[in-house]
Amino acid sequence: MTIRIAALGVSHWHSIYDAAYLRHLARMPDVELIGVQDSNPAVAAQRAAEVGHPPVFASATQMLDTLRPDFVVALGRHDTMAGVAHDLLERRLPFLMEKPMGLNAKEVATIAERVRAQGSYVAVPMPQRDSAFVRHARRMLAEGAFGPLSHLYIRTNRFTSARYPAWNCEWMLDPQASGGGSLRNLGMHGLDIFLSLTGETACVTGAQFGHHALRTRVEDYASVLLRTPTGVCGTLEVGNTYPRRTTEGVQPGAGRDKLLDGADGEWKIVGRDALLMAKDGNIRIVTADGEQNFSDLPTENPAYHCLASILAAWRDGLPPPVGVEDCLNAVRLIDEAYVLGNATAV
């Protein structure tokens, strides 16, 4: 069965940059990209030209009414996401939506409530769930290798947020449209992994935000402290101050984390009996008996794999790999951090 997919809000950079959803959809077997939409038709036409010239629409309503897709990929500005999600739910269309699904937890909660009531298929792409770090962490947790957990440390520092205007997403630097900076965007991944691996809820115990390097209205750096009810601690660092901007289309070098190409990233989970760390595509495991160091890079593009998994789960009648509730849990922590750190956010 060929899945007929329409994409909304394709001026979002993930349409053809970074995760590059449209590029992956265009080369997937049994998938047809039947149309793209954006309120900026010139940008939509540029995006369409990169992926085989599917029909371009300025109106989401017109595209959905005309094409009647099987599945929708919903991108767009953060301040429009909740409205788009509710429209798709009203139409009973299955879809994936880019995080954070709204400006704040209040907006995302309305989506989650409706998804629960309808039983709709709504997925949130989180490729870090399939990373080497998470795979090894889950294996070691299942084996009881860590003993009681102590803490997780997650750092994601990507290159300058000046990339957003260059990619037709200048709204990302406006807190009223984006809901925040590096924490609202990049922090989702680390918070989701912290919650997923601990299997617990968490609260924010400390937060600070920096604007000093890039001098934009949204933060270019954030650090957040977390703690679960059982006492597992977490430290999250996110930023847009990596000094080198990678060239789109260039294959990452052997020493770089392909999930965060061109980034300064580190992922660590520590217990009484073991430590697991991922950095620059390498895995380090330390126990009382010794130490292992080895490379573990993905064999296929993580975003492609994530998209394929989402579509396969829908086709097989299974729940999405990551759903709205998962997104909401992370967004709530982001909101807590902004309040605690007295940062400018919606």
Residue ranges, per PLM feature:
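Predominantly a Rossmann-like dinucleotide-binding segment in NAD(P)-dependent oxidoreductases
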Residues: 12-17, 128-215
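Rossmann-fold dehydrogenase core element
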Residues: 110-128, 148-151
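Contiguous beta-strand/loop segments that form the cofactor/metal-binding neighborhood of enzyme cores
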Residues: 185, 191-281, 306-318
